[in-house]
């Protein structure tokens, strides 16, 4: 049995902030948490802050490789390293609107990564192609379409156990299709949508629990047309991700959203990698990425996201940590195993 002890000046459990705590870890599992009896500042395994590992449910690649362009396990291994260095022990690798062949290749890549013993990857997030072309953002219109039930069945059967999240526009997909996806154990996230306030609210009331990158590629909040954003703000339970880099969303807008949504707002990096290959060439412009002249992804890590939330938005550290761990775990129904520290 491998046993070690960690002392924390501050322990963020996901629910509370505790001071001067001792954690006993046996075989990679926390077995004890108790107040420290000793002065811990000089202890070898003493840390200023101990918090739940972060979770990024929308990230496309790292180190000059996008999964959609290089759909192999060799692309996911360095992505795990990138996420880990930014504090995220787990992630959902993402592929944007593309061909069916690329989706299948990405499914195979995740499967192979698991077979090779790869860590951290929870599965695949398929963003599109069943989205609204008027809110396509950087997605390529040539692949965007309304799906048939047979197309959905074929993709989900091929990706069984691999596909964990699908972002779609609820006004583009029938309720039959949405319910079929959900019945397959896949999280449906609403995004790249031009739905009206009432259409979006109806979709949330009918069971869509999550939306993708607040403010980006969705009908905006206006005083006579509250749109998709207004529906998210007003709904009592729907959660939504946000990209806190100051480019995807102004920091003051994040502050407004946080006041409206509270624990329903969580962080994704939406991070991509620089590449000139494939239909989505990404070029680093300052500290963000553009594809074909359109904002297409961030250069964030989850750790830099926390720093932005605290320094730029004014969110307390304890709450910022929840937004990168506890809340995304809840959004993908993983709260029992991720997003908190407990015995």
Annotate each predicted stretch with a short phrase.
Residues 17-25:
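A conserved glycine-rich beta-strand in the N-terminal activation segment of trypsin-fold
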Residues 48-51, 57, 67-120, 143-158, ...:
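Alpha-helical scaffold segments that flank or form the walls of functional sites
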Residues 60, 81-92, 132-160, 202-214, ...:
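Active-site gating loops and adjacent loop-to-helix segments of metal-dependent hydrolytic enzymes
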Residues 60-64, 77-106, 119-132, 159-173, ...:
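Divalent metal-dependent hydrolysis catalytic cores, especially in the metallo-beta-lactamase
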Residues 126, 181, 211, 309, ...:
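Conserved, mostly hydrophobic/aromatic
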Residues 157-276:
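Active-site core of metal-dependent hydrolases
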Residues 231-240, 258-343:
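His/Asp/Glu-enriched, well-ordered alpha-helical/loop segment
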């Amino acid at each position: 049995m491998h046993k070690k002890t960690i002392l924390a000046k501050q322990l963020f459990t996901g629910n509370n902030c505790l001071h001067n705590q001792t954690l006993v870890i046996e075989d990679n599992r926390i077995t004890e948490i108790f107040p420290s009896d000793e002065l811990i500042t000089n202890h070898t395994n003493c840390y200023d802050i101990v918090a739940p590992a972060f979770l990024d449910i929308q990230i496309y690649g790292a180190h000059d490789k996008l999964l959609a362009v290089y759909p192999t396990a060799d692309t996911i291994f360095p992505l795990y390293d990138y996420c880990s260095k930014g504090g995220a022990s787990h992630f959902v690798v993402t592929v944007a609107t593309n061909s069916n062949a690329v989706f299948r290749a990405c499914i195979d890549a995740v499967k192979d990564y698991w077979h090779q013993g790869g860590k951290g990857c929870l599965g695949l997030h398929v963003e599109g192609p069943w989205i609204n072309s008027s809110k396509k953002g950087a997605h390529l219109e040539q692949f965007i379409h309304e799906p048939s039930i047979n197309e959905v069945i074929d993709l989900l059967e091929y990706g069984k156990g691999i596909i964990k999240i699908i972002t779609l526009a609820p006004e583009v997909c029938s309720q039959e299709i949405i319910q079929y996806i959900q019945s397959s154990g896949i999280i449906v996230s609403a995004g790249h949508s031009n739905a009206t306030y009432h259409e979006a609210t109806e979709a949330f009331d009918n069971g869509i629990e999550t939306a993708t990158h607040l403010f980006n590629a969705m009908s905006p909040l206006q005083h006579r047309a509250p749109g998709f954003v207004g529906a998210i703000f007003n709904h009592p339970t729907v959660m939504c991700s946000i990209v806190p880099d100051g480019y995807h969303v102004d920091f003051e807008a994040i502050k407004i959203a946080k006041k409206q949504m509270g624990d329903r707002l969580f962080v994704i990096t939406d991070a991509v990698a620089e590449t000139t290959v494939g239909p989505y060439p990404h070029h680093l412009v300052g500290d963000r990425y553009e594809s074909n002249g359109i904002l297409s992804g961030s250069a964030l890590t989850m750790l830099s996201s926390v720093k932005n939330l605290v320094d730029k938005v004014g969110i307390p550290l304890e709450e910022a940590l929840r937004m990168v761990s506890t809340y995304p775990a809840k959004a993908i129904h993983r709260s029992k195993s991720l997003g908190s520290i407990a015995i």
